[in-house]
Regions:
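A short helix->beta-strand "capping" segment at the edge of beta-propeller domains
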Residues: 29-47, 217
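Blade-level signature of beta-propeller repeat domains, shared across WD40, Kelch, NHL, RCC1
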Residues: 271-310
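Beta-propeller fold detector
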Residues: 42, 83-87, 126-130, 173-176, ...
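Bacterial N-terminal signal peptides
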Residues: 12-23
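Beta-propeller domains
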Residues: 64-83
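Beta-rich, blade/repeat-based domains predominating
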Residues: 45-62, 88-109, 114, 131-159, ...
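A short loop-to-beta-strand structural motif that recurs across blades of beta-propeller domains
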Residues: 72-74, 114-116, 161-163, 202-204, ...
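Short loop/turn segments that connect beta-strands within beta-propeller blades
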Residues: 76-81, 119-123, 165-169, 208-211, ...
Length: 310
């Protein structure tokens, strides 16, 4: 702001400055939250130790599994308050969650070898996909076409699989000879599938064909220590990687360069999503304290953007 020349101009500028100062003092103007600094969203212990699978809707709410007790999905509001949104069928326990649109969500049931579809208005739950040859499944990723990809680890044997779930709900095993497949994500252009192997400490990249099959397996990133869990992309194709055991989340460029490392206030972050009202809040499921933590980011999340009305 520039103030010069005549007295009347000076008085006008002083008046504007006073209005701005009063607004700041009265709380009308609020400084933006700093980026990549984690703070708690919920109270300690509102989830079980199975807290996982965060996903964000268009209204700024966050959904995560095992709220209050196993077998539930909780809905957490932007102020940190929450409620049980749905109870999964008896014996089922959820893990990864993905929104297909503003009308339904998909939930990986790692006990019953299912992927559920939950209608958001009615909260009705149906089996979208089932295969007895699945170990779990664990986490989910969605292509622009609506095709789902599921990671499927066998923790006891140290092995894992990748599945493609078509629009008709039919599951096709793409790879059956991998390590402990866990975090999974599709790039913004739908051409690359990322899959993390937790125990092996590696993230693989695959090319995605026009038919949804994957090929061209290659190392995207390796780690010398600790595990890794959830993967999520922003609109620019940067990956957010939860480092289970390290207590951090990495922001990684599409070329594999680490851009940010965020301390998330607990040693065992299990998964992450990007959402909030503007798509620029990261929500992390934090196992050590059984809570959600949050931090602001510089670019909106990919899944959040896809939910926006066109």
């Amino acid at each position: 702001m520039r103030c010069r020349q005549r007295f009347s101009s000076t008085v006008g500028c002083i008046t504007v400055l006073l209005v701005v100062m009063v607004g700041v003092v009265s709380g009308q103007a609020v400084a933006p939250s700093p980026l990549f600094i984690a703070t708690p969203l919920t109270q300690v212990g509102v989830f079980t130790s199975g807290i996982e699978g965060p996903a964000c809707d268009v209204d700024g709410n966050v959904y995560a599994v095992n709220y209050e007790r196993q077998g539930t999905i909780g809905r957490i509001r932007p102020d940190g308050s929450g409620e049980i949104y749905v109870e999964l069928p008896q014996g089922s326990v959820g893990n990864g969650i993905r929104f297909g649109s503003q009308r339904e969500m998909y939930v990986a049931d790692y006990v019953g070898h299912n992927v559920f579809e939950v209608q958001l208005r009615s909260r009705a739950i149906t089996i979208y996909s089932h295969d007895d040859n699945m170990n779990q499944p664990n986490d989910l990723a969605m292509a622009p076409s609506g095709v789902l990809y599921a990671s499927d680890p066998n923790w006891a044997e140290g092995s894992g699989q990748i599945w493609r779930i078509g629009l008709d709900g039919n599951a096709t095993r793409l790879f059956g000879d991998m390590g402990t497949t866990n975090g999974i994500e599709v790039s913004p252009d739908g051409r690359t599938l990322y899959v993390g192997e937790s125990d092996e400490r590696v993230i693989w990249a695959f090319d995605i064909g026009v038919d949804g099959t994957v090929f061209g397996k290659r190392v995207f990133m390796r780690f010398a220590d600790h595990g890794l869990d959830g993967l999520r992309s922003d609109v620019d194709g940067n990956l957010y990687v939860t480092r289970y055991g390290a207590g951090t989340v990495l922001k990684v460029s599409p070329s594999g360069r680490i851009l940010q490392e965020v301390n998330v206030l607990g040693a065992r972050p299990s998964n992450i999503c990007l959402g909030g009202m503007d798509g620029r809040t990261a929500y992390v499921t934090e196992v050590e304290h059984r809570r959600l933590v949050q931090f602001r980011v510089d670019r909106p999340g990919l899944a959040w953007q896809r939910l926006r009305p066109e």
